[in-house]
């Protein structure tokens, strides 16, 4: 500071005696010297911290490395990992970002309590700490424990009677799904909305005993809000790194639209909650909303309602949990099923292998069930390989250490953004032979059984791994296996194969495409789509 003061006094004295031209020149020199001194002071002050951080590119002042990231952040991170190693850091805007691409490191870190935090960003602040995906601390721990227990009671487990209960919910929608596709009668069909309504109804049944038809305007609006939200989130994500960009007109417009969409979704869910409250019977728990209402009533009776949900508004918390579970569950399952179709179109021999296995094991008089899964290694491995190759959430969700953490001789500061590079793990040639190839056999061992290596992590790892992984696996198997059992798929004449590049937003989605379906008739009982709908509804 003494140097700064001396320079200022020196320049002021000179400005008093020099002509305007000389004064401007001296001012430029002064500003340059001041900037240099400030930089030197910053370097001295931060030398120890910089030395302890993982290596990585510095980037530019204010914006950091953002300018060099491009539109596909996961791809750029993979390139940087090759240059700086499996643990590197950089600044994206004002945020220190630490990226991990080694699966052992990811597993080790995300099992630790201190890595369960979420970064404090403008997007997170709009949620006010509500929900399950972006909540932290005691609220997150209590909610995860509660949801894990209640979802298991509804059948999100491969063990016991609950499995049959969940399978019944899913198969109700599988029958509707197959019946609707039968109606396409070989004409080109966009499967995205058909899959959306089927997957949505599984989640709606579980959470609030509600289902939609594909022509329901409320469902169409609902689905649009989710898809638009995913797209808008990708557009404004930069604000999390440079908060001052919130004042940009385009960012402000997108943020306002997100707020409007969230408010509309909240009103819909609040109506559902109000309907449940009017018909609530603690002796007849119908769904997840009822479980929450039961928990709220119990807390009121015990006089602990002020502490419930860590003091947050009860119904706001319930609404955000529903939004979290619905958005995460519907979008990811739908996108994965679409990618599986892309891979089947691009690899017809693999599709035929799946169908031959289903014909041999299941037969031609019924649809596959969860009990068949253990006897269908080709079908299961095809699903797993599709998940590996697409890696629809390539960066998973961002974590943030709750305190400074020492890792591999480096310091990961509290509050920094920690990103697990899932796509890099799934495309690592040191782990997977020719990872660019679609090869389901990589998941089958020498005994013909499915083997999932520990570095296959599509649902994340550790304390914050996906709550719905069991439901997701069941849905993917039952929908895909039933679809393959009932149809051959092909592109409409003259249409190119869908690209593997995809569209990058909150998830990586395949480009829009249509398919032509040719029936693979089942026996007289299973072949009638009207009968299938009746069976599924029983």
From Swiss-Prot:
Primary location group: endoplasmic reticulum
Tissue: Expressed in body wall (epidermal and muscle cells) and mid- and hind-gut.
Induction of synthesis: By 20-hydroxyecdysone during the three larval stages, at pupariation and in pupae.
Subcellular location: Endoplasmic reticulum membrane; Microsome membrane
Pfam families associated with the record: p450
Keywords attached to this entry: Developmental protein, Endoplasmic reticulum, Heme, Iron, Membrane, Metal-binding, Microsome, Monooxygenase, Oxidoreductase, Transmembrane, Transmembrane helix
GO CC entries: cytoplasm; endoplasmic reticulum membrane; intracellular membrane-bounded organelle
Cofactor: heme
Amino acids binding heme: 466
PROSITE patterns according to UniProt: CYTOCHROME_P450 (PS00086)
SUPFAM superfamilies hit by this protein: Cytochrome P450
GO molecular function: heme binding; iron ion binding; oxidoreductase activity, acting on paired donors, with incorporation or reduction of molecular oxygen, reduced flavin or flavoprotein as one donor, and incorporation of one atom of oxygen; steroid hydroxylase activity
Transmembrane segments: 24-44
Gene Ontology BP term (one): chorion-containing eggshell formation
Source superkingdom: Eukaryota
Membrane topology: Single-pass membrane protein
Coiled-coil spans in chain: none
EC number(s) stated in the UniProt entry for this protein: 1.14.-.-
PANTHER family linked to this entry: CYTOCHROME P450 18A1, CYTOCHROME P450 508A4-RELATED
Function summary: Probably involved in steroid hormones biosynthesis.
Protein name: Cytochrome P450 18a1
Biological source species: Drosophila melanogaster (Fruit fly)
